[in-house]
């Protein structure tokens, strides 16, 4: 699909290839627009065979987000082949580990974004409305190990210190840290402890997912975990983990880029909407680094990360046109 568009550079990692397409039709001093894509998927073809039913295409990555990659390439090709020379260089970066947190590609993404004027993320649009994702929550993952003292539950009920009982108190405490009206959630998703019903448990463990819309909330949650204290004497708490992704906040730079997208949509008579997403993308990284970032520019569909993942085929040309229309209007952005 990229044939004839520009030079493709490949970097091999343990989790697959990182691909960089540089579309630079004419020499220029203008900084590029960076489009972020990923080609790893949640499901494989054995689990989710590729097939079409009327205007729906089903298969791994048809929504998240190989469709966004294909859409981007066709938008570039359409501009070049219809005589609309690109008003700026465009770099398209594709990584292979986004679904697992982009650990192998994070540094490369940040390096490229610092050379760019703006970042467009071709992740899928919001499932129902097709909204662009103007903000995204950041996330963190924590593990809490609780050490108590074992004893026979019948013969020596006062001799033990229950790690499971302590865990129950800590779950309530951690969930109370949530501030849902302000976008902060705390979820103890895994809780395990003890070995037998007749033994007072000496160990318990919790895995906790946290989400936040602002850096301020991220700091508050982080400090709460760092200061976590036992309820019962004799209990030891060990907390590991921390923040994984920064939030993609509502910044003036991001709003300026969104304004250009609104103009691009208006030219197509396309009713553009925006939303806030609870999941993370590589756009979280670039936005937190201070680079104007806009997300959700990929395809419309539904079933994100589900076995019914699907692409709305009939809306695909319009989403491609939106990407092309936006690229055409970014010549003076950030200059």
Residue spans of the language-model regions?
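Short beta-strand segments
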Residues: 36-37, 93-95, 120-123, 145-147, ...
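Metal-dependent amide/peptide-bond hydrolase catalytic core
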Residues: 12, 124-129, 134, 140-335
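Active-site metal-coordination/substrate-binding segment of hydrolases
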Residues: 29-94, 100, 312-318
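Short acidic/glycine-enriched loop/turn segments that link adjacent beta-strands
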Residues: 14-17
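Acidic/histidine-rich catalytic neighborhood of metal-dependent amide-processing enzymes
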Residues: 65-66, 70-135, 179, 331, ...
